[in-house]
Swiss-Prot record:
MF terms in GO: structural constituent of ribosome
Official protein name in the record: Small ribosomal subunit protein uS2c
Gene3D superfamilies: Glucose-6-phosphate isomerase like protein, domain 1, Helix hairpin bin
Family (UniProt): Belongs to the universal ribosomal protein uS2 family.
GO cellular component terms given for this protein: chloroplast; mitochondrial small ribosomal subunit
InterPro entries: Ribosomal_uS2 (IPR001865), Ribosomal_uS2_bac/mit/plastid (IPR005706), Ribosomal_uS2_CS (IPR018130), Ribosomal_uS2_flav_dom_sf (IPR023591)
Cell location: Plastid, Chloroplast
């Protein structure tokens, strides 16, 4: 895998608050190599390490995108949800930003059935099929469609398991991470000072609470995916 330059600036990361970890009482000792200091009761993340692993992650997604691989971005907590959907749409990736339904990947056949149901209901709505039904039946189907859209809207075009999964906040998305590990799907995970850095294939130490920090990490990854996709189109 070729190493590239991704313009990851330490000062820009500091302005985004990427270096602020959790309180010193709330930490995972395995994160010690990624922590540079303690300040006012919180751990400070070593941004040189962040830059290194973010660069590695950008190289990985560029390489995968240049070969036409598919990505899934997962981030369901309120602070991350909008950022995840915008980033995924920009990079033409699949995403989950509301709730991870257990077995979404490990029980893919069930997820596929739900997606087929979702597509059928969307078609029915677009062709005004609901209008031809009794009001009560139409209301039930509309509720079903609304629920499916909430939880599966970001993966509605996914036809198989993703090649790489990007996880925003490892603690929050632990179930998704375990499913990826079970299936052998490569993962890139944003980890704060309370996380285990040994679980994901590439762990990026960073503040997972600040919107600016999450945005910074996502923007770099999405840019790399976009560059890789452009390379794929040019070479195909």
């Amino acid at each position: 895998m070729t190493k590239r330059y991704w313009n990851i600036d330490l000062e820009e990361m500091m302005r985004a608050g990427v270096h602020f970890g959790h309180g010193t009482r709330k930490w995972n000792p395995r994160m010690a190599p990624y922590i540079s200091a303690k300040r006012k009761g919180i751990h400070i993340i070593n941004l040189t390490r962040t830059a290194r692993f973010l660069s590695e992650a950008c190289d990985l997604v560029f390489d995968a995108a240049s070969r036409g691989k598919q990505f899934l971005i997962v981030g369901t907590k309120n602070k991350a949800a909008d950022l995840v959907s915008r980033a995924a749409i920009r990079a033409r990736c699949h995403y989950v930003n509301k709730k991870w339904l257990g077995g979404m990947l490990t029980n893919w056949s069930t997820t596929e059935k739900r997606l087929h149901k979702f597509r059928d209901l969307r078609t029915e709505q677009k062709t005004e099929g609901f209008n031809r039904l009794p009001k009560r039946d139409a209301a039930v189907l509309k509720r079903q469609l609304s629920r499916l859209k909430t939880y599966l809207g970001g993966i509605k075009y996914m036809t198989g398991l993703p090649d790489i999964v990007i996880i925003i906040d490892q603690q929050e998305e632990y179930t998704a991470l375990r499913e990826c590990i079970t299936l052998g799907i490569p993962t890139i995970s944003l980890i704060d000072t309370n996380c285990n850095p040994d679980l994901a294939d590439i762990s990026i130490p960073a503040n997972d609470d600040a919107i600016a920090s999450i945005r910074f990490i996502l923007n770099k990854l999405v840019f790399a995916i976009g560059e890789g996709r452009s390379s794929y189109i040019q070479n195909s």
